[in-house]
Amino acid sequence: MRQDILVPFVTYPDANTDALVDRAIAVATFLGRDIHAVALEVDIPDVSNLVSRLLIGLPDMIRRTEADSRARGAALLGAIEAAATRAGIRFAGESASAEPALFGDRAAELARYHDLSVVGLSASNDSARMVAEGIVFGSGRPALLVPEAAPPGAFDRIAIAWDGSRVAARAVTDAQPFLERAGEIVVLTVTDDKPLADAGLGTRLAAGLAARGLTARAVSALRGNRPIAAALQADAAAHGAGLLVMGGYGHSRLRDFVLGGATEGVLSEPTMSVLLSH
């Protein structure tokens, strides 16, 4: 059975950049997967009244905004289709519309039909973050978060943020296609962030991976006074990893996500590719 990756492009108010195209092609090539891209276009409800129509022309403003969103989506779909063709990757594309506040929900619905989503993040793109949160916590599928502003990293060495938790174990399972292709796996355990059930839990995971024929080693790290997300990403990079695998902590409270510290950090300030799974 062929597997594929979903690449959701946000188009409003800011669009993803062509960097996401390059990252998605690299992931599909590494995993040998097809690409299914979707342009998330804005659908703005017309709540105008007579005064707003006469004074500011609100319906016309809405139509222009939606047209701009569709144009950005078409450009991104065209770019990734052309790149996929050059790389010999099977491609399918579509557009989907949603109200701005529902981009995350729409993306989660779409992601359920694909094996992995590749989501581009940047510090100023709140819609992209909404999509990432929606997919991680609402789709039941893993998401690969790629910072559009950072240089792409190779996946030949992968770090696992390991604390022995359920979500970390889920992330390791979801990352198997990457782990099986990696030259080395670094099991990274931060020992001064929170109580750990077992001082040797990193060594135990590394041994389990090695028993499956993978090259793995366990390392310990100290958070110190750094935010936990910054510590994990920096230490993973220091060990030569181009991908960090970690579990996503969070739950929905009245539609607002309450996130764990590491999860919040990688969504807010990603410095490397992170496979996040809930």
What are these regions (language model features)?
Residues 42-43, 81-117, 212-244, 250-255, ...:
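Structural beta-alpha unit
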